[in-house]
Amino acid sequence: MEQQIHITLQFDLAIGKVNLNEIVYRLEQLKNPLMLEILKTILTGYDDLMADRLSPQSGVMTPSKMRKGLGRHVRKGDPNNRFCHGRCIRKRGYRQHLRVLSTVFGKLQLPLRVAECRVCGARHSPLLDALNITPYSRKESNFEHEVIEAVIDTNYRRLVEGRSIDISLGGIHNLVVGSDVDQMAPAASVDLGDLAAIMADGTGYKRQKGEKGELRSVIGITTGGKVEPLGTFANTQWSDIEQIVKERFKQTKAAGIPFIYDGEPGLDDFLADVTESQRCTWHGPRGLYHSMWEDGLRKNQSQPHIDQLKHLIGIELPKGDYELLKDQDKAAVEDKYRSSKAEIAELIDVFKEHGYQKGATYLENLSERIFTNIELWLKTGVIAPKTTSLLERIFREIGRRVKRIAWGWSDATVTKLSKMIILKKYSKEKWEQYWKQKLGINGHFSIHFVHAELRPCHNF
């Protein structure tokens, strides 16, 4: 049903003195009050339309087809809260107090009509049911959307002061707790054939009562270079995470893609039946420093070995189509790969001779998993990631929010917030799809601007 809203705006313009900036400034101030008034006009008009269709006009009822979906209410006195079949009402005025709802435009003060069912006598508000507003709801979901996006994009102080969103820190917590974002990841929804690599890492955060917590995340990198979130978990064992992640795969056969990690305990055999383990080439030398420090070496003593390791694992792969590369280019990479492995083996022997057992053990474990990306390229020509830098950036985004806003929150709530951050920042299509479904955007309402006309004011 099409209707029009006629708006009258009056402005006072100082001829020859006003500038564009002041005009835009005043219009910006008018935006939210104007949107609230338009919203209120639409809703009151909708309420009047429903009341007219549900009540007899000159003793004649509106055809049932025109009343379909309107006036639903629970039958009065029914112990099972079943719906009444009556769709005919008596108008009983309006509720004594206005209904206040938080919206993205501000506080909406809405008068609610009271209707009395002619069949069971129950009193209800047809508008609330038609708009899917629960009896005790005090906000609409676009407000929740605005708050969640603001939390992801900025810190709490700027959220309140910069965006003028009236909500407490506890209110943000309640929105995140009540979110159903954790239901977005259906089982068997990810095809391993679409992934170029999988990464996993963890970061610390402050739990309730000041205890230290561990937030862990697993992501996939698609062949198109996009992030495919595979799961975020708070204080969960890697073995349990592995089982949950596997349930998201359409198949769990070996895919020949690298699993990149920083050497964290518990990840050496993570997803070993579907991926090939690849140690992060940035964390590799860093870990050697710590191992040799445990052997008693200081930085100036271990630095030459660290520099040597960086050189050995820093094999650059030729760019371009693998099939078009010259045989000598491929052979050069393979020669460099074999010589690097041999030199690392020699370095391990040197460490053992000098009694650097921690360093030797570390290098032995590292050498088994540091060249996976090279081996994959030699077999298939696929250039896979070799560092966890992307996941590190994601954790920096998560850390800024979790450590400043979500400190002291429960594990489940921190998990939800981190999932929201990953989706919003790195999987925008899924994020938008989630909110469209949550907000019920189904094409049942549209509004557009028709025209603006300048008329003389009668006060001039």
List PLM regions with ranges.
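Basic, low-complexity segments
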Residues: 39-138
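Acidic/histidine-rich catalytic cores and adjacent linkers
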Residues: 2-74, 78-81, 251-278, 303-460
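Short, amphipathic alpha-helical "recognition" segments used to contact nucleic acids or chromatin
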Residues: 138-154
